[in-house]
Amino acid sequence: MNTNVFRLLLLGSLFSLSACVQQSEVRQMKHSVSTLNQEMTQLNQETVKITQQNRLNAKSSSGVYLLPGAKTPARLESQIGTLRMSLVNITPDADGTTLTLRIQGESNDPLPAFSGTVEYGQIQGTIDNFQEINVQNQLINAPASVLAPSDVDIPLQLKGISVDQLGFVRVHDIQPVMQ
């Protein structure tokens, strides 16, 4: 009889352990699905922003639009050559938003010293019928690069606009500067 009781206890323990293992696997699966849903939502939002950025740039006759949520560069044909531009390190601060404008030359030559204009603000309406509101601008200057291909990071302080309000950054009038 002792062996039957022992077998019964062992069998009960195995059922309990198997139930725990299954619950653990179910919890892990739920966590994986939740993480995947969050990643898909973020990917969908980035895709929408990339599409919007591409449409704005297709319609733009002057400069290049960069949308904070796009997280992808855009090309600008300028007086100093073809440039790839992107926004990185976008963070809130007490006066608005700080970010870095990354400019990369696409040729094998170093970039000359240059200046340009950065406009930023909000976009109201649809991409097909939009209006830029609360637009502010600032001039940028970059020294000549020594190395090629050239990357220039320009820190920007966008005063008076929070990260959530920032709808666009537009860079235009890139011109060489004589030193």
Give residue spans per PLM region.
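Sec-dependent bacterial lipoprotein signal peptides
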Residues: 1-20
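Membrane engagement elements in two modes
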Residues: 20-88, 92-98
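Solvent-exposed, flexible loop/coil residues
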Residues: 5, 70, 115
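Short, solvent-exposed coil/turn linker segments
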Residues: 16, 22, 162-165
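Membrane-proximal structural modules of membrane-associated proteins and complexes
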Residues: 73-179
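Contiguous hydrophobic segments
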Residues: 2-5, 32-51, 155-179
